[in-house]
């Protein structure tokens, strides 16, 4: 009998999500040691192996994250950054912001004449923070040696891994009009070693990246921020007109911020604060917390409308958010957003009979920032230590700049800033609170959440990838688990809706109930249908009997949630 639980790893095809398309679990009868879930079953297994060897959830998370940077390089890697929420075994929370920062030479109008420069090439990258984030987690919470946690990813990169359905999908999504994976020699070494793009089932290696990770395994994260690796990074960026310097890399530090929290149906929900999207997630849930029978199947149509309206108001609140170091009064504003008074005021504005004009949601300078190149991981252990983390290089394959000597894929996070007098590449209105400043961190939709049961014990660790859809996916998954008493795999398999206020429409995955969508249309919502897979979540739960369950995103072919 296998020694771990595997849940929710089956592929989802268009329109089939309503059949709860997750794999039948196979498991040990008593998985009480811990759990890991990520977008790669290979990487989740590495995390589980760490738990087997006596490591804790922090160790498992670090090992899993390094592996994701190898296999899920289109989403994540040490050339990017992210946000991490940690619950200690004593029940204390820490929000580690390792988001990329604008280089010292960055300025507000740097992309006014060519917004494409914020997407591709040397000017598109913020200073990477992933390694400093993992370093902080390991130093404060880890138990096994750093090298022991990095080396599994080194082996995967050096000796290769199978080209999966997910990798094929993301390569095909990226390359129809841009053949950089095959035409750029720096990329082709890995992605087209035989003159053609690697195919499903073939083995792909990333040997330069393996060497880089091995150096970091031996010498620690400083090896990335100073010395030959740093020099190669800056040289590659400079060659493509970048202005990042060795000083920018050397001076990067994580920001430790105050987490945000609400009480929802008696459960304590802890999330992240600005510049992440955690406030929007918790604000939505705080608004609907005032509705009775929110999980009643008989009221599903009205519940869907109310949830969507709460999302729209919360996205309107988002327009004033940014980096707290650069936006005056943000702490007080965030506190007011999550107050019960504000939630009640919003509920009083929500009509059960119609949706409202966009202006009613107060979207001053509203901007939404899709970030498709994101990856989420959750990990927890029997002590109650739990981590929910989302990492990103922004767009798929980041800035499409790989450092030739190191194999590091650089982010294009600078596009997440607002550009004055110009909508960003996705057509959204600029938000002054999110204008570029040297050292500033751009606004994000990333929203990791950890829930405690009414008795104060760890209950749910959840989060999502998928740009602006991160927020709405996380909201719905929490709603399914807490209001509708679903397991994590069941919750992840439910069809999702998404409404970010701008554009003024609500999208439904193909499997969503037709009668509910018709009801929404009858209230004036602009409804549209989308294929599943635009948001990808991972989650785990600690049950009252002390056993864990975990779920990988069923919209991804190769995700994996495991418990041991």
What are the residue ranges of the model-derived segments?
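Fungal secretory targeting signals
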Residues: 1-23
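Active-site rim segments in enzyme catalytic domains, especially the processed small/beta chain
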Residues: 70-95, 243-245, 386-454, 484, ...
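Extended C-terminal subregions enriched in glycine
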Residues: 324, 420, 440, 474-475, ...
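Short beta-strand scaffold segments in enzyme catalytic cores
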Residues: 76-77, 81-88, 375-380, 448-451, ...
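Short, small/polar residue-rich loop motifs at catalytic or cofactor-binding pockets
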Residues: 256, 371-374, 396, 444-446
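Internal maturation/activation junctions in enzymes
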Residues: 195, 290-393, 405-406, 413, ...
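Noncatalytic scaffold domains of N-terminal-nucleophile
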Residues: 24-45, 49, 55-219, 224-226, ...
């Amino acid at each position: 009998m296998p020694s771990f639980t595997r849940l929710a790893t089956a592929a989802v095809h268009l329109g089939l999500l309503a059949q709860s398309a997750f794999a039948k679990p196979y498991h040990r009868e008593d998985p009480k040691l811990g759990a890991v879930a990520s977008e790669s079953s290979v990487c989740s297994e590495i995390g589980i192996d760490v738990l087997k060897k006596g490591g804790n959830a922090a160790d498992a998370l670090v090992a899993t994250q390094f592996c994701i940077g190898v296999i899920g390089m289109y989403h994540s890697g040490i050339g990017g950054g992210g946000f991490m929420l940690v619950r200690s075994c004593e029940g204390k929370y820490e929000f580690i912001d390792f988001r990329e920062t604008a280089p010292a030479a960055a300025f507000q109008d740097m992309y006014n004449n060519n917004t494409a420069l914020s997407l591709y090439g040397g000017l598109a990258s913020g200073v990477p923070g992933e390694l400093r984030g993992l370093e902080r987690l390991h130093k404060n919470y880890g138990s096994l040696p750093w090298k022991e946690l990095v080396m599994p990813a080194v082996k995967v990169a050096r000796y290769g891994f199978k080209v999966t359905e997910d990798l094929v999908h993301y390569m095909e999504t990226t390359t129809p009009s841009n053949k950089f994976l095959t035409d750029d020699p720096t990329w082709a070494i890995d992605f087209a070693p035989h003159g053609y793009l690697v195919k499903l089932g073939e083995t792909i290696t990333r040997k330069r990246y393996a060497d880089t990770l091995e150096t970091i395994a031996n010498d620690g994260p400083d090896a990335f921020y100073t010395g030959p690796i740093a020099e190669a990074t800056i040289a590659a960026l400079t060659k493509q007109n970048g202005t990042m310097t060795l000083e920018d890399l050397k001076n990067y530090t994580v920001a430790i911020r105050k987490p945000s929290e609400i009480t929802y149906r008696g459960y304590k929900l802890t999330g992240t604060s600005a510049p992440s999207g955690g406030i929007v997630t918790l604000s939505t849930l705080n608004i609907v917390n005032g509705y009775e029978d929110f999980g009643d199947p008989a009221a599903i149509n009205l519940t869907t409308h109310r949830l969507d309206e709460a999302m729209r108001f919360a996205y309107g609140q988002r327009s004033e958010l940014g980096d707290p170091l650069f936006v005056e009064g943000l702490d007080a504003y965030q506190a007011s957003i999550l107050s019960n008074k504000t939630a009640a005021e919003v509920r009083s504005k929500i009509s059960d009979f119609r949706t409202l004009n966009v202006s009613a949601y107060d979207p001053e300078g509203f901007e939404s920032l899709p970030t498709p190149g994101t990856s989420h991981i959750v990990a927890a252990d029997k002590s109650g230590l739990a981590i929910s983390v989302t990492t990103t290089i922004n767009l798929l394959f980041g800035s499409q700049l790989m450092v030739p000597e190191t194999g590091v894929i650089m982010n294009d996070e600078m596009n997440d800033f607002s550009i004055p007098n110009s909508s960003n590449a996705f057509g959204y209105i600029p938000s002054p609170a999110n204008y570029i400043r040297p050292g500033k961190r751009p606004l994000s939709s990333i929203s990791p959440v950890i829930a405690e049961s009414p008795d104060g014990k760890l209950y749910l660790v959840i989060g999502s990838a998928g740009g602006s859809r991160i927020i709405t996916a996380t909201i719905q998954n929490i709603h399914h688990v807490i209001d509708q008493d679903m397991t994590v795999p069941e919750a992840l398999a439910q069809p999702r809706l998404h409404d970010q206020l701008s554009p003024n429409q609500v999208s439904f995955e193909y499997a969503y109930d037709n009668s509910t969508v018709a009801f929404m249309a009858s209230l004036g919502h602009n409804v549209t249908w989308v294929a599943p897979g635009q948001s990808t979540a991972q989650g785990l739960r600690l049950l009252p009997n002390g056993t864990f369950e975990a779920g990988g995103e069923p919209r991804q072919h190769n995700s994996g949630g495991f418990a041991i």
